[in-house]
C-alpha cells in the first residue's frame, strides 16, 4: 500500500488521501447534488404551481352538475333521423383522409431520401429537415384554416391541409427508416454496376418497405380522426355537421348521432390498423412503426 506524509508527519494511506480530497456527495452544496432528473422535476413542479389559475371557472355559473344534466337531457337519446346524411359525410371524411395520405406518401418519399444522412449530403439533409420541421410545427387545424381561406369551404381544403401536415410526419418517419438500413447491400449493387435507382430499388426498398407501409397506415388512421375535426372550420367532411349541430342546443341529439358514428368508425379503423401492424411486425422480425 502506498503512503504519503502530511505536514505533521502523520503517515496516510493513498485511499485515505483520496477520500480527503474527494468529499462525499452529502458534503457538497445542494445545487451541486442536483441531477437532470431532479432539475426537470423541480421545473415541472413550478410549472404546475404557476398553472393553478387554469382551474378557475368562468364565474358565470358554478353549478356544473346542473349544466351537465341539462346537456344530457338534450344530448340523449341520439336522433337517428340524420343517420343517412351522417354516413354520407363520414364517407367524404374517409375519402379526404385516403387522398391526403396517398398524396403525402408520394411527396414524403423523395423528401425522406434528402433528409437521410446516409443518402444525401449534409447541406441537403439540413435544409430538408428544416422544411419538414416547419411543416410539422403547424397543426392540422391551422393548415385547414389557411386552405379554407385560399380554396374555399370544401373537401379540397381538407385534402390539401392534411397532405401538408402528413408530409411533415411521414418525411421524418421515412428518413429515420432509411437511416436504419444496412447500406452494404446498396453499395455492393453499385459496385457491380447497378444504377442509383436500381440500387435503391433492390438494396434499400426491401429493407424499408414494411416500415413505410406501417407508418403510412398509422398516418391514415390519424388523418381519419383529423378529417373529422378540420371540417369544423369548413374543410369538408363530418366536421361541418358537427359545427352545424353544436351551435344549436336544440340539435344536440343530432350532434350525439354524429359523434357516435365517428366513434364507431375511428375505433374500427384503429383495431384494423393495429391488427395489420402486428402482422407486419411479425413478418419483419419485431420492427414496428414509430408513433407520436
Indicate where each model-derived feature is located:
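Generic hydrophobic transmembrane alpha-helix motif, especially the helices
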Residues: 132-166
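Membrane-cytosol interface at the C-terminal ends of specific transmembrane alpha-helices
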Residues: 153-204, 210-219, 271-274
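Generic alpha-helical transmembrane segments of integral inner-membrane proteins
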Residues: 98, 102, 106-110, 138, ...
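C-terminal transmembrane helix and the adjacent membrane-cytosol boundary/short C-terminal tail
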Residues: 253-292
Amino acid at each position: 500500500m502506498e503512503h504519503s506524509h502530511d505536514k505533521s508527519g502523520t503517515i496516510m494511506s493513498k485511499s485515505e488521501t483520496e477520500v480527503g480530497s474527494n468529499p462525499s456527495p452529502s458534503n457538497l452544496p445542494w445545487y451541486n447534488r442536483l441531477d437532470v432528473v431532479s432539475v426537470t422535476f423541480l421545473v415541472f413542479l413550478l410549472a404546475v404551481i404557476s398553472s393553478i389559475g387554469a382551474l378557475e371557472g368562468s364565474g358565470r355559473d358554478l353549478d356544473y352538475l346542473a349544466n351537465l344534466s341539462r346537456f344530457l337531457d338534450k344530448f340523449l337519446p341520439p336522433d337517428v333521423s340524420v343517420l343517412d346524411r351522417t354516413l354520407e359525410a363520414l364517407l367524404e371524411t374517409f375519402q379526404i383522409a385516403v387522398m391526403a395520405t396517398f398524396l403525402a406518401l408520394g411527396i414524403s418519399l423523395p423528401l425522406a431520401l434528402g433528409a437521410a444522412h446516409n443518402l444525401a449530403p449534409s447541406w441537403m439533409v439540413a435544409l430538408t429537415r428544416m422544411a419538414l420541421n416547419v411543416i410539422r410545427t403547424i397543426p392540422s387545424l391551422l393548415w385547414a384554416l389557411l386552405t379554407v381561406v385560399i380554396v374555399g369551404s370544401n373537401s379540397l381544403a381538407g385534402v390539401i391541409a392534411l397532405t401538408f401536415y402528413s408530409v411533415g410526419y411521414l418525411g421524418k418517419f421515412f428518413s429515420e427508416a432509411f437511416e436504419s438500413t444496412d447500406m452494404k447491400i446498396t453499395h455492393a449493387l453499385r459496385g457491380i454496376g447497378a444504377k442509383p435507382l436500381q440500387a435503391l430499388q433492390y438494396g434499400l426498398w426491401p429493407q424499408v418497405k414494411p416500415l413505410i407501409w406501417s407508418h403510412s397506415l398509422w398516418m391514415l388512421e390519424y388523418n381519419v380522426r383529423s378529417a373529422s375535426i378540420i371540417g369544423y372550420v369548413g374543410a369538408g367532411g363530418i366536421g361541418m355537421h358537427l359545427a352545424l349541430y353544436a351551435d344549436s342546443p336544440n340539435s344536440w341529439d343530432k350532434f350525439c348521432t354524429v359523434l357516435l358514428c365517428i366513434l364507431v368508425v375511428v375505433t374500427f379503423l384503429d383495431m384494423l390498423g393495429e391488427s395489420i401492424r402486428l402482422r407486419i411486425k411479425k413478418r419483419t422480425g419485431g420492427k414496428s412503426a414509430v408513433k407520436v
